[in-house]
Structures are given as C-alpha cells and as structure tokens.
C-alpha cells in the first residue's frame, strides 16, 4: 500500500469527529509527501506490518500517531501531550523529524510526552520547536516501566525553554557513539544515510528508499533495535531454587537475532544475589544468603555491547517459617491520644508482625474500615486517635 501526493477532497461538516482515515492489514505501507491533519485525534492509516511515513506533515492531539512505524523527514504539530497511545511492538522511530509543540506562552512548563501508556521510542537527528516564550518538558511517557528504554542521538532542543529527557533517568539511552546507531543511520563522507532498509527490509528486502545496495555493501543489515526479557518482574525465595532469566534481541520488524547479553544487579541488596552465566542470552539468579529475613527488591539490568538495554525487578522474599508463639493475648492500652498494642513472644524473634488497624461502628466489627497498616518489617504497634 502506498500514498504519494494524494489529496482527499474536503467535505465540511459542523460535527466534531475523529479523523480516522483508514485501517490496513497490509504487510507494507508507505506514505510520501502527505498531510495528515486533525485536531481531534488522528489515525493516519495504521495497522500494516511495516509502515514508513516519508516527508509528511501531521497535526494532532492525543492517541493520534501510528505507534509502530518509521517516520523520515516528517514534521509534527503537537497540540496536546500524548500523541501516541502506545508504541507497540518494537515501537516508533523518528529520523530527521521536527516537532512543533503548540502550547501557550503562559509561563507554565508543559509536559510533552510521546506516549500515553509506554513503548519504545527512538529519536534520531530530530529537533523541537515552540513559541518564543513556551516552556516544555519532553518526556517519554508519564509512568515508564522498569523495562522501558528509549534511544536518542543528535536531538536538539531550544536552549533554556525546553527540558530534554535526561540520560540519568534510566529510561534514556544516548547511542550517538554506540554501534547501535548503525541500525538507524550511517555517517559516510559527511553524508547521512538513514538505514530504513535495516528497519523495514524484512525477509523480502523491501527497499523503499532505494539505498539497500549501499546498506548491504556496508554490512549494516539485520541489526537488532530492541532487547526484551521474559518478564518485567521475577521472584526469588530465600532457601528456594534459582531462576533462569532469558533475553532476546529483535530487529525492528520483529525477527529474533542472536546477541550476547550481559546482566548485572543494582540496588541495596545486590550483593545478596549471584549471577551465573548460562549462555550468550541467559543467566541464572540465586541468593547467596538463605537467611534473609525481610522482603526487598533489586533491579536486574540487561545490555548488549552494541547499546541495547532493558531491565526488570527482582523481588526477594524471606524464607517462610512457622509463626512465633505469644506468651499471652495481645493487649491494647490507651496512652493519652494514642492506642498502643503490646505483646511478647515465647522466644526471642525478629518481629515481622503484620498489624492492621480497623475502625468499626460496633463490637461486632460490622462495616469495618482499614485505618492503618504496617510497612514491611515495621509492625504498626501505635495508633493515633
């Protein structure tokens, strides 16, 4: 499917509707020199297995753009903060694009997210613009997952007025000096060749820009652009079995490629976990100390030498033991405007009691309402009235 210099005649109507132009289940879609304009969402022909928008203009609000596509030499007018609902699959790639953030000059800092619910974004050789006194904070998504990594190289922002995503935020990876950059572009003799062939070539060597021969000669094909783990959260039990962690590298069109993945643990309890390499794409995690007596959480990071990254939480649970015995019934005493719960164990124990306070209108505990809870390993023995 392709649309080039195509104009759909305007039919004015007073109704306010979403501009959902078309759906397609085609394998390939290429739009060139097209304008997609809607101030109430947008839907610029989505659904193809591989989509390229070349030298196109977009005007939109939220949930508007194709979240699994390549945009080359395109221009965007953002009238709201979340132009993509979700960057699905291997995400969205913007090559040499310009983003105009159409926010008022009101002195407020406006949040410009790329997605509403997450997904991978790559920004290459792109720039942001806005009105002279507009302030904008550029972010990937409002609630990023631990696994989310977005990639950027040579992105420019209006100095002093725009705040870019920080590399230190753990979700932003600058690939300008990394081998991964060649998945998106090749710099040669002062010229930039955008590697759309690597991104969209697939098994049938689709070459919409006609530079596939140059890319193949340079050996820059089948370069993965995404690293995934099997889950975003793993569980380790003290005294339990080790867990096997597997990762995979995907090309932009979703084909799995072999790659060497390196794993490491970060967090306050990182020293309590041992990593054993199993293969080039997997590892075993095992607790060094089986006597851990509290719950904790660390972050497992995975990366390749080319520059791909991802992450996951590893939750560590203490060994399950029998509940300690009490010397007698617990007692609640009134101390001024405080209630204090007192109890003792028959043997010295690390007190991990989970105490929950309720409020009820009668002694039969009808319509009880939770008013206070314990934090992990911190029994809530005192309640303020």
Task: Name each region found by the language model.
Residues 293-306, 380-385:
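A short beta-strand micro-motif common to beta-rich folds, especially ectodomain repeats
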Residues 257-261, 348-356:
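Solvent-exposed loop segments of extracellular immunoglobulin-like
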Residues 233-241, 331-337:
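Short, solvent-exposed loop/linker segments at the N-terminal edge
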Residues 284-291, 369-385:
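Solvent-exposed segments in extracellular or luminal domains encompassing
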Residues 223-231, 321-330:
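Proline-enriched interdomain boundary motifs that mark the N-terminal boundary
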Residues 264-282, 360-369, 373:
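Low-complexity "stalk/linker" and mucin-like segments enriched in Ser/Thr/Pro/Ala/Gly
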Residues 1-223:
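Sequence-level preference for short, compositionally simple segments enriched
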Residues 242-248, 336-345:
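A short beta-strand segment in extracellular, disulfide-stabilized domains
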